[in-house]
Amino acid sequence: MQGRRDRKNRGNIIRKYLLTSILLLFITTGVNAQIEQPRRVLEIGIAGGLNLNKMDFQPTIRQKLLNGANGGVSLRYTSEKYFSMICAAQLEVNFAQRGWEEDFDDGTGNSYSRTLNYIEIPLLAHLSWGKEERGVQFFINGGPQFGFCIGDSEEYKGSWKPEERPTSIRPVYGKEIYNTFDYGIVGGLGVELKTKAGNFFIEGRYYYGLSDIFNNSKTDDFGRSANQTISVRLGYSIRIL
């Protein structure tokens, strides 16, 4: 009798263990499925818009925002979904106009601006929330950006002469661009509408340059001369994989 009771108890324990193990397996599988859901989506896109530019100068130069254009192509690969967050990597190649416009406060109507033309390569993490197929997604982008200055132009208006300007900022007029390679950090947020005909989006970005366009040694005229840009972009993308 005692032996049968022991075997019965062991059987009950084994059944409880198996049931518990199966339950834990289902729970773990369900949690993992909710936490990490693989995706394999490749999209190409185009975008363009407006840049509002200024330069971070030391010593300071009084400025207005200089308008410029931006436009380019993108490649986005979506790899997985964590909870409700869709994770992707995005590579872009863009043309962008940067630079600055000096703010003359002497009431004469004189002006000076300098436009810098760049080919830019942002390497972005793209995180989004919302509908994956049909509907609205909200997203953020962020990462490093590299650029190459391919040309620049200056525009003088009015009767003033560079030698009449304050001594601290006079060297900027006609000064050659020393560093054509630019790098910095870019971040943005936007809304994307996913439709059967493709995806339409609008995005705002801010770029903070970490490199200087002029030499910045102790004997040079400027200790800092870095790009800063606010961008507004409209775009369209389609899935190719």
Regions flagged by a language model, labelled:
Residues 34-41, 80-87, 130-137, 194-199, ...:
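Short loop/turn motifs that connect adjacent beta-strands in outer-membrane beta-barrel proteins
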Residues 51-55, 96-100, 145-151, 207-211, ...:
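Structural signature of outer-membrane beta-barrel domains
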Residues 55-62, 97-117, 150-181, 213-230:
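Flexible, solvent-exposed loop segments that connect beta-strands
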Residues 35, 39, 182, 187-241:
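Predominantly the C-terminal beta-signal and adjacent terminal strand-loop region
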Residues 33-76, 239-241:
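Short glycine/proline- and aromatic-enriched beta-strand/turn motifs that initiate or cap beta-hairpins
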Residues 46-50, 71-77, 95, 121-127, ...:
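Residues on the lipid-exposed face of transmembrane beta-strands in outer-membrane beta-barrel proteins
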